Every structure is written in structure tokens, then in C-alpha cells.
Amino acid sequence: MGLAAPKNRSKISNDPQNTTWANNTSRFGHRILTSQGWQPGDSLGASDAAHAAHYTVASQSHIRVLLKDDNLGLGAKRGSERAENFGLAGLESILGRLNGKEAEVKKEEERREEIEKRAFVYRKYGMMNFVSGGFLVGDKIKSRDEVKTETQAKVEVKSEPESDGAKEDDRKKKRKRKDRDEAGVEGEEEPKLKRKKKSMDLRDQAKKDIAAESSKDKKGKKSKKDKKAVTSDPEPTSSGVASPASDPEPLTDKARRKAEKKARKEEKRLKKALKKAAKEAAKPMGDVEDLSSESEDESTPSASRPATGTSTPTVSAAGLTFNPRGMHSVRQKWIRSKKSATMDAQAMREIFMIKTPS
């Protein structure tokens, strides 16, 4: 039925805590519990249980019922988010500091912070109370002091005075162990030093080879320049670098890779140019003339043309027709009207309200 259903109004009783039922001693539950040894005010369960230490006054009191008078869901946060309670804690701390009660204010803030932390843990993980489950080993509970005294007594029994001969043997063993360790360290360091020396020699040799090659290259370049200056024409060349064809020496790997890359790029560029030229040649001359006339018509001011709701198909530079639809057609129409308005001098005067001299 929904909203059309009959309204059943429930009347709130004058006893919301249900104390009449709780105080009624003629109930079956009350009678059977009292026969088992329970009395009003006691908590349920064995009094000598492992978790009996965690019982509080709330365990013996009545269950509290909170009247729901809002549209919040079940388990929603209530009370602290009400408008009348907003900012009261901050105001109290400010007034306390002004009255010279900084220590009390700090304690109160720490207490509130601790409560918030506990509430966060409760919301995220639930209530976590440690309940002792008894002891695994032994029936008697011993204090820490007793355990400490027992361990000290055991240590005293074990530590007996050693003879002088045993002490001397220990010293000899330690000395021998120390000598062996030192010999092992020296033996490990020797191959390391040899390897280091060898690597240093190799580095020096490599440096010498590089220096010799660079000096040889410089000499070769100098002799080439001298030959070129003697045999070259008086006209200045476009680039000072010698061509790879006239270079008698073989190219390095890097230069060869660069030359190959350059040749590939040049080949690609030529292919593209040939393809473009073939396309242009294949196009009929009539299409080209039509395109040029259409572009001229578009460039002239079209103030006299009436604006229609339909979009006209546009021709791209490649000869393909493009018929805009939807958002594109509206935008193209707006661009055309804007272009025509800016190209018309009279329309611009009307927009900017400029009077023409009569």
C-alpha cells in the first residue's frame, strides 16, 4: 500500500525504562533465577569465573532503552553531532586558558583525546577486553621475585672455581685462535692487493693507448687539412667537413651508423614526396578549379546570405567532404556567423555602437 496504508499510531507508555516489568517478582524468570541462587542486583554467571573481574555496575543494572526520535540509521552517531553541542569543547579550553587554568585544560584535552582513540578502536575493531584464560603450565602462581631468586641460585651452583691448569689451557687456546684469525686475514688481503695492482696497471695501459691514438688522429687530420688547402679550389665549400667518399680511412662504427640513419631518412622523405606528387597528378583539374572557387566564395563576406538551420558539407584540402553533425554542426554554424559579422564593417559598427558621419 505504501503511503496509502492506514496509519497505526503507537503511543509511548509512561514507563520507557520498563521498571515495572523489572521489579515484578511474580514472573517465571524471576522465580527460577531466585531458586538457582540469584538475587536482584547480582550479575548472571558464576562468581568465581575467569572473567568475573571484568564485571562492572553496568552488568547488574537494567538495560537502557534509547528513544529514537530522528531519521538517522541504526548505529548512527548521535549526541556529539548536534548543533547545540558543536564547538563547546573548544570554547571551554579557551575560557580555561584565559582564567589561568592551563594545566587543567591540558589534562581535559588529553582525556578527551584518549576517549576519541578508544572510540575509534571500538568502531574499527570492536571492544577488546583482555580475559585471562588461566595458566598452561603449573598449578601454582609464582611471583617474579621468587622466579628471579631461583635462577640466581642455579647460576651460583653452576659457576665453580676453575683450577690454574685449566685457565692456562684456555689462554693458550685463545692465543692460537687469535694467530689463526690474523693469518687468515692476511691471506685474504694478499689476493685483493694483487687484483687491485693488476687493475691499476691495466688502467694505465689503456690511458696510454688512448693518448697515442688521439695524437695519431690529430696528426692525420692536420696532414689532411694541409693537403686540402693545397689542392682545393679558391671557391669556399658549403661545409668544412670532408665527404665520406673522399676519406681514405675507414669510418668508425658510430659515424657509419649515423650515415646509414641519414640515408634511411632521406629515402623515406623522397618516397613521401613521390607519393604526394602522384596523388596530385592523379587528381582531375576540374576538382582543383571547383575547390579554388569554393575557397574564394568562403573568403568573401557573406552578409547577404540567409542563415539556415541545416549545416552545409565542407570540403577539406585533400578533397574529402565532411558533413558535421550534432555539436560540430552547431559550432561550425556559430563560427561562420562570427566570421561573417567580423568581416562586415557595418555590422561591426552596430555592435560597437559607432556612429557613421552622415
UniProtKB/Swiss-Prot annotation:
Compartments where located: Nucleus, Nucleolus
GO MF annotation terms: nucleic acid binding
- Keywords of the record: Nucleus, Ribosome biogenesis, rRNA processing
Q: Where is this region: Disordered?
A: 1-26, 146-342
Q: Which residues form the G-patch domain?
A: 25-79
Output compositional bias ranges, type Basic and acidic residues: 146-171, 199-217
Judging by the UniProt lineage, the source's domain of life is Eukaryota
Among the entry's GO cellular component annotations, what is one?
nucleolus
Q: Which SMART domains match?
A: G_patch
Which BP terms does GO give this entry? rRNA processing
Q: Where is the composition biased (Polar residues)?
A: 11-26, 300-315
Family per similarity comment: Belongs to the PINX1 family.
| Protein name, UniProt field | Protein PXR1
The organism encoding this protein is: Phaeosphaeria nodorum (strain SN15 / ATCC MYA-4574 / FGSC 10173)
